[in-house]
């Protein structure tokens, strides 16, 4: 019985495997203001399709994430929902302006602009079908 449970679990895990295949697209915009390492990370995340940009404090996660989000919006023709902790929502929108990315803060589920910034606690207000 224990072997059967282990085999069932292994089959379950195999079904969840995504493999290393890319499911994204070729980047449409990689601005010159990104450092080489940032450009490489954003390029990888866009091509991968299902990836996460993880970087230490001060390495530019916000501009990298905003460029990623802008690429998704440009590719899909829909806004991208960009989630942040509540403490940095406004800062993210301000940085978007600095980095020439159209971003707006929304608390109520309205989707407007290229990138819609909100916090985790407000996610239930948003319809995923409105976003790329």
Predicted regions mapped to residue ranges:
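Conserved RecA-like helicase motor-core motifs
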Residues: 101-109
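Conserved pre-motif I regulatory segment
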Residues: 10-54
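Walker A/P-loop
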Residues: 48-68
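Charged, low-complexity intrinsically disordered regions
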Residues: 1-11
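SF2 helicase catalytic motif II
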Residues: 129-132
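Conserved Walker A/P-loop ATP-binding site and its immediately adjacent core
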Residues: 62-72, 76-100
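Residue-level preference for the first positions of well-ordered beta-strands
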Residues: 50-54, 79-81, 113-115
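Conserved two-lobed SF2 helicase motor
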Residues: 110-126
């Amino acid at each position: 019985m224990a072997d059967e449970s282990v085999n069932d679990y292994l089959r379950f895990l195999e079904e969840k495997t995504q493999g290393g295949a890319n499911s994204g697209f070729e980047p449409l915009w990689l601005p010159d203001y990104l450092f080489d390492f940032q450009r490489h990370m954003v390029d990888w995340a866009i091509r991968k399709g299902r990836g996460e940009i993880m970087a230490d404090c001060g390495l530019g996660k916000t501009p990298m994430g905003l460029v990623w989000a802008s690429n998704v919006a440009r590719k899909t023709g829909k806004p991208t929902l960009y989630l942040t902790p509540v403490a940095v929502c406004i800062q993210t929108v301000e940085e978007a302006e600095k980095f020439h990315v159209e971003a707006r803060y929304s608390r109520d589920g309205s989707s407007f602009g290229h990138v819609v910034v909100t916090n985790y606690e407000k996610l239930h207000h948003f319809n995923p079908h409105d976003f790329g």
